[in-house]
């Protein structure tokens, strides 16, 4: 069950020597079952380079799981945060609708002018960005493939009159030895659907005369998502 964070207080943050040292913030959420409000500990920034344990809690989505102290309801309560990787020099901003992303991106670039910045609106999209960058792939190419695979598989399912409908397609893994990129398709049936794409397709897009310029970093282009991919199609 999803709870709604509605108040953030007691927030502290400091920046030292090219790194963000984050302290906790207190977030007040309301239990969707009993409507009791209670406080949880949250983070403004997760520095994956400095705190592997916290990174793993995020990857497993344990960071957003809480139990209502009043009724015992298990609650998923995502909140806005930043994810930093100092080695790969990028920052992903998770915006749950309560932050000024433009100002935040500007602040990040003032401290880290060489960073790639991405803005996402969903925890699954945040995790996808992390997996893409850890695989040393271009997230713009992968996001474009997400969209193309979604469209192609959805059209095939409709042609077969299948009751299965896709919700979204996300990057799963890059299998270097097998030269393939694996995608997973979230769907209304809860089935595990995986799609293998030859790495040659990724490289062909990277070298496409029409699309290659679109896959380069551009100032102010931080929301690399479905809408961005649709505009290229």
Q: Each PLM stretch: what is its role?
A:
Residues 2, 16-17, 183, 219:
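Feature targets compositionally biased, intrinsically disordered low-complexity regions
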Residues 17-97:
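N-terminal cysteine/histidine-rich coordination modules
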Residues 88-225:
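Long, contiguous alpha-helical scaffold regions
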